[in-house]
């Protein structure tokens, strides 16, 4: 999965 903000265990989509 993707997440914003990236702070958990998912794919950092904020990069």
From Swiss-Prot:
Keyword presence, Disulfide bond: yes
GO MF annotations, alphabetized: ion channel regulator activity; toxin activity
Disulfide bonds: 1-14, 2-10, 6-13
Compartments where located: Secreted
Tissue: Expressed by the venom duct.
Record flagged with keyword Transit peptide: no
GO cellular-component term (any): extracellular region
Keyword line: Disulfide bond, Ion channel impairing toxin, Neurotoxin, Secreted, Toxin
Family: Belongs to the conotoxin M superfamily.
Domain comment (free text): The cysteine framework is III (CC-C-C-CC).
Entry function: Probable neurotoxin with unknown target. Possibly targets ion channels. In vivo, intraperitoneal injection into fish provokes paralysis after 5 minutes.
Name of this protein: Conotoxin In1696
């Amino acid at each position: 999965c993707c997440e914003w903000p990236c702070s958990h265990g998912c794919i950092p989509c904020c990069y």
